[in-house]
């Protein structure tokens, strides 16, 4: 068995970065040049922005709760669905989307590393 030379300097990551948001919080579990993994907690009745990304690809996986998910080619043509634990969805660049927590919800997001690639179309917290 061949062991990578990179493992000689391997260190277990012990801390995650927690980022408070108006709708709850994010925990940045892994951030590297290729991808980002986050755990997101959204409190009931709150939502992220109606938004899209120019470069970022992202996938969501619901761990607990219920999320209203809006998705479509533009803000006037959105499909609404409810996501439950075990449901997932992948969003390509330029796809308009929004999550809203029906009840307190926890989900994972895995994405390409374009953390600042957010174009907000609507936001109830004044971040447009």
Which residue stretches match the model-derived regions?
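Double-stranded beta-helix
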Residues: 10, 14, 19-20, 77, ...
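A short glycine-rich, His/Asp/Glu-containing loop-to-beta-strand
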Residues: 15-51, 56
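Glycine- and acidic-residue-biased ligand/ion/polar-headgroup-sensing regions
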Residues: 55-73
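Short acidic-glycine-tyrosine-enriched beta hairpin
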Residues: 73-94
């Amino acid at each position: 068995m061949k062991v990578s030379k990179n493992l000689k300097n391997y260190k277990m990551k012990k801390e995650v970065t927690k980022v408070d948001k108006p709708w709850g919080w994010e925990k940045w579990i892994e951030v590297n040049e290729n991808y980002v993994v986050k755990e997101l907690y959204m409190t009931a009745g709150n939502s992220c922005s109606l938004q899209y990304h120019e470069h970022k690809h992202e996938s969501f996986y619901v761990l607990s709760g219920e999320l209203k998910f809006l998705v479509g080619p533009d803000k006037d043509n959105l499909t609404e669905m409810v996501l439950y634990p075990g449901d997932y969805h992948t969003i390509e660049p330029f796809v308009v989307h929004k999550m809203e927590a029906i009840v307190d919800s926890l989900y994972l997001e895995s994405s390409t590393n374009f953390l600042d690639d957010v174009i907000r179309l609507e936001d109830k917290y004044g971040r447009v």
